[in-house]
Amino acid sequence: DPLTVAHATRMLLKDLRSFAHPRWTQTGFRRAHGSEAQGTTMRNLFGQVDGTVNAQSGTDDFDELVWAREGWIAGGTSMVVRRIHMDLDRWDRLDRSGREQAVGRTLANGAPLTGVNERDEPDSAATTPIGFPVIPEFSHLRRARSDDRTQRIVRRGRRGPPATSRAAST
């Protein structure tokens, strides 16, 4: 609810006035609570499911990834904000196959290109009849997954309004 978020933001900023001041702000949004069934993976502005393999809150996997166990941050966590430009006009020019190849998942339900359902384990060794990987090595799915536990993170994507372009206004 944008009204609730605006009020909470104002209260936080008001209470921090004597300690800090904002350097920049970023508007973002997710689906409103209750607008989708529990456990539904959100979609990004490209229309792709986003965050399928994130560790789920309340699990040992989540706790291991999020909560520091030692050092100055023991019992705490950290956060990185990364702003990613999404070129929606260029994305619109890709056909369905190109979009699915770029992400490594189907548009319809987010299943890996080697699976049927969103949470199916992708088969990285599967190849096409002419020997190309079914899930391309450049795909988001391959690049975002790692077997090295030290490279795993929990992502909490927020969507911002897309920039208006000439293509969108004509």
Language-model features, listed with the residues they occupy:
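Long, histidine/aromatic-enriched segments associated with O2/redox biology
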Residues: 1-170
